[in-house]
């Protein structure tokens, strides 16, 4: 079974809290936004969306810039 191309990860203080994989980027982006809303108030929270095929971080919260 394929885990999916797009991975969304929520970490708190660098430790993984939850991860999910989706084949569709639009679905993964919706889940990313949902998890920012659900978990963004946790101390040290970070949410990332990565294209597992290319290794590129597509978006992250909070913004690293």
Predicted features by range, described:
Residues 10, 22-46:
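A short, charged, amphipathic alpha-helix used as a generic interaction element across diverse proteins
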Residues 15-20, 55-59:
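Surface-exposed loop/edge segments in extracytoplasmic proteins
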């Amino acid at each position: 079974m394929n885990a999916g191309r797009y991975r969304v990860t929520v970490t708190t203080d660098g430790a993984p809290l939850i991860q999910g994989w989706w084949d569709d980027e639009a679905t993964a982006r919706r889940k990313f936004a949902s998890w920012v809303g659900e978990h963004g108030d946790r101390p040290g929270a970070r949410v990332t969306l990565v294209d597992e095929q290319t290794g590129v971080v597509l978006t992250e919260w909070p913004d690293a810039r």
